[in-house]
Amino acid sequence: STAGKVIKCKAAVLWETNKPFSIEEIEVAPPKAHEVRIKMVATGICRTDDHAATGNFVTPLPIVLGHEGAGIVESVGEGVTSVKPGDKVIPLFSPQCGKCRVCKHPESNLCIKNDLAAPRGTLLDGTCRFTCKGKSIHNFLSTSTYSQYTVVDEMAVAKIDEASPLEKVCLIGCGFTTGYGSAVQFAKVTPGSSCAVFGLGGVGLSVIIGCKTAGAARIIGVDTNKDKFAKAKELGATECINPLDYNKPIAEVLQEMTDGGVDFSFEVVGQLDTMMSALDSCHAACGVSVIIGVPPNAQNLSVNPMLLLGGRTWKGAIFGGYKSKDAVPKLVADFMAKKFPLEPLITHVLPFEKINEGFDLLRSGKSIRTVLTF
């Protein structure tokens, strides 16, 4: 048994930004009290990992990135009650302590114990569980899934159906849930409504799946890459438009298409100009616009208050507005019950050692989601 012992394993270490990941042998310490050590089985490559790898999302280095994954509990620290060795689990980049003001609030989900706002790169106790060549290696967003083994706090892991295929449901750890939940849980898209989705990558396509599930009548995909339109329509988009095909602002085009603007718009690009376009494209009196895309670095928007005074709602969500520990097991159960698909989002499956190839696919726009398997 490996319980209580240091485990030596492979991990993708980022020593410095804008350099390839280095596959290294690292040591993973046993879990302390209220911590869980997980043997990773599969992990997705998400744009947020790329933002960290390029330095646009500032995090301490060296680090083991990865935050969208699934695995099996190897051992648990003292006092852990929600999971046991052998359980299938998904680590949670947005934890749920259950005690803070946010966790107790019925409508909010960004637990104050998260490591998103100003990443320390540690577990809750302020220390790391990884070492390599004598150096301490930082954790990423409470998860660090680009390692054969990782250690997480108990509040940052959810037990899931033991029959679930981990190489698919790992997407529920971030990308799918972030998009799908933004439509069904956070914006609460209504039956018969009109929706516009800006950005048709993995998260944008997941928004489309959510809009369709919620019963939207019109789902308009917006992207400058028309190669993405076929997949968007396959998953529920009723039409797709390319802003480059018009000689006027895309918000005007959408307003004309939808009698003054859509009921719900979603920005899944992470650019200031598309955030403004998405806001302007929802109806001035009753529209709701949701920001999902993360801007690579902190920039300010300047907004005319008249855009909001008529009754528009403008809001943002992380992880689809879901309380993570509560929602993830239910979402996995819904997937197992065939309430939504994940397979169309996975375009590439690569062995973990080919992580740099996976990031090349992301950066070149050739993949929707690449899943790395261990």
Curated annotation (Swiss-Prot):
Reactions catalysed, as given in the entry: a primary alcohol + NAD(+) = an aldehyde + NADH + H(+); a secondary alcohol + NAD(+) = a ketone + NADH + H(+)
GO BP of this protein: retinoic acid metabolic process; retinol metabolic process
EC class of the enzyme, as a word: oxidoreductase
Note on how the cofactor is bound: Binds 2 Zn(2+) ions per subunit.
Gene3D superfamilies recorded: Medium-chain alcohol dehydrogenases, catalytic domain, NAD(P)-binding Rossmann-like Domain
Family designation: Belongs to the zinc-containing alcohol dehydrogenase family. Class-I subfamily.
Main location: cytoplasm
InterPro entries, alphabetized: ADH-like_C, ADH-like_N, ADH_Zn_CS, GroES-like_sf, NAD(P)-bd_dom_sf, PKS_ER
EC number: 1.1.1.1
Keyword Thylakoid recorded: no
Binding site for Zn(2+) 2: C97, C100, C103, C111
Cellular location(s): Cytoplasm
PROSITE patterns reported for this sequence: ADH_ZINC
Binding site for NAD(+): G199, L200, G201, G202, V203, G204, D223, K228, I292, G293, V294, R369
GO terms assigned for molecular function: all-trans-retinol dehydrogenase (NAD+) activity; zinc ion binding
Species: Mesocricetus auratus
Subunit structure: Homodimer.
PTM-bearing positions, type N6-succinyllysine: K233, K339
Keyword NAD appears in the UniProt entry: yes
Modified residues (N-acetylserine): S1
Record PANTHER family: ALCOHOL DEHYDROGENASE, ALCOHOL DEHYDROGENASE 1A
GO CC field: cytosol
Gene that produces this protein: ADH1
UniProt keywords, alphabetically: Acetylation, Cytoplasm, Metal-binding, NAD, Oxidoreductase, Zinc
Highest taxon listed in the record's lineage: Eukaryota
UniProt-annotated binding residues for Zn(2+) 1: C46, H67, C174
Cofactor dependence: Zn(2+)
Name of the molecule in the record: Alcohol dehydrogenase 1
